Design a protein with these regions (language model features):
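Nucleotide-activated chemistry modules centered on ATP-dependent adenylation/adenylyltransferase
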Residues: 2-407
Length: 407
């Protein structure tokens, strides 16, 4: 009986060519797995393609709700944004894909897992760290890093497929390299490879339009959160995945969430990409607006710092680590009272605050108002400032004694 290998399969040219390559070079029975995180139409005809290329079977694992509830929500609660821009759409999906690959490998009794991530990117790290953490005994085959992999272009991959009786309508023409799930879609390649070039948004965008082409009239949206988790949109209770889907429609319509970023990859190089994250951008902004009202100053500052660390951890593929569990435990503690309603207006790429309420709001109008109130005496500030500024005053006095001008 042949040994089995589980292949992370997308249906694209790379992973399609890997099926006969695995059979030819390793004599494996190939079991394909496609993990559906919300790729939409990209799944059409996938099973027929995998079987036609020599796979013994294809698993399509629908994990959209698990992805949103167990991976997206923690990142939203953390305010996890990599290098101030990237909302981690690809990064946070990879550990879940790795988890499902391992589950199928165990079910099938497979001895190896194969992926088609390139040797220059981050995904090879994310997949392999996940597999190593969950199944250290399973062999990992990275096709693009394997000495037996000789294909180096779309043309050579197409020719290899044809030589093995696989005739599919793949084009040798270059196109954008894209990754899509319910949270985002990324675009790399073509004119984007030169940072001096402006993106061809008319040809590139999938989920929405540029702000210039958005409607002239804004649209109001109301979102409710309970303990940092979105629970309803415009008064309608929804599960998280449905909220994200609806926000994608609204955000795309109004030109929200398009970023052009040069990011620092884990492997050391810089890469340029355009990301569309309309729903995610709205959700992150709404959550932050609510936190501004509820968290005290020290907790807000520490959580912001932790959010940056959490983003780096997710970006680097370290989801299945004790550190992620510890950081997430801290973040969840901060979310106990992040409950309330956020109203905002979407208008030509902007998310404009239109009102925030919470039963746990720390904003007290009688204290914050410029008018006289009972809870705060303006004279109290004098003693506070004298103490708060004492070190400044002492330093200045000492420098004056020594005839030193510091500023």
């Amino acid at each position: 009986m042949k040994e089995k290998v589980v292949l992370a399969y997308s249906g694209g040219l790379d992973t399609t060519a890997i099926i006969p390559w695995l059979k030819e070079n390793f004599d494996y029975e190939v079991v394909c797995v496609c993990v559906d995180c919300g790729q939409a139409e990209e799944l059409d005809g996938l099973e027929e393609r995998a079987l036609a290329c020599g796979a013994s079977k294809l698993y399509i694992e629908n994990v959209i709700d698990e992805f949103c509830d167990e991976y997206v929500v923690p990142c939203v609660q953390a305010g996890a944004v990599y290098e101030n821009k990237y909302l981690l759409g690809t990064s946070m999906a990879r550990p879940l894909i790795a988890k499902k690959l391992v589950e199928v490998a165990r079910k099938e009794g497979a001895t190896a897992i194969c992926h088609g991530a390139t040797g220059k990117g981050n995904d090879q790290i994310r997949f392999e760290l996940g597999i190593k953490a969950l199944a250290p005994d399973i062999k990992i085959i990275a096709a693009w890093r394997n000495d037996k992999w000789t294909m180096d272009s779309r043309e050579s991959e197409i020719e290899y497929c044809k030589a093995h009786g696989i005739h599919l309508p793949f084009s040798a023409d270059s196109s954008y390299s894209r990754d899509r799930n319910i949270w985002h879609i990324s675009h790399e390649g073509l004119e984007l490879e030169d940072p001096a070039n402006e993106p061809n948004f008319q040809h590139l965008l999938v989920l929405g339009v540029t702000p210039e082409k958005a409607p002239e009239e804004g649209e109001y949206v109301t979102m409710t959160f309970e303990k940092g988790v979105p629970t309803s949109l415009n008064g309608e209770k929804m599960k998280v995945s449905d909220i994200i889907g609806r926000l994608n429609e609204l955000g795309g319509k109004h030109g929200i969430g398009i970023i052009d970023i040069v990011e620092n990859r884990v492997v050391g190089m810089k890469s340029r990409g355009v990301y569309e994250t309309p729903g995610g951008t709205i959700l992150m902004e709404a959550h932050q607006q609510l936190e501004e009202l509820i968290l005290d100053r020290d907790t807000y500052a520490m959580k912001k710092e932790m959010g940056g660390r959490f983003a780096s951890l997710v970006y680097e593929g370290k989801w299945f680590t004790p550190l992620r569990l510890a950081e997430q435990a801290f973040i969840e503690e901060t979310q106990k009272y992040v409950t309330g309603e956020v109203k905002f207006k979407l208008y030509k790429g902007n998310i404009i605050k239109a009102g925030t309420t919470s039963p746990y709001s720390l904003y007290n109008e009688s204290i914050a108002s410029f008018t006289t109130g009972d809870l705060y005496d303006h004279h109290d500030a004098e003693g506070f400032i004298n103490l708060f500024g004492l070190s400044c005053k002492v330093r200045a006095m000492k420098m004056a004694e020594q005839n030193v001008e510091m500023f």
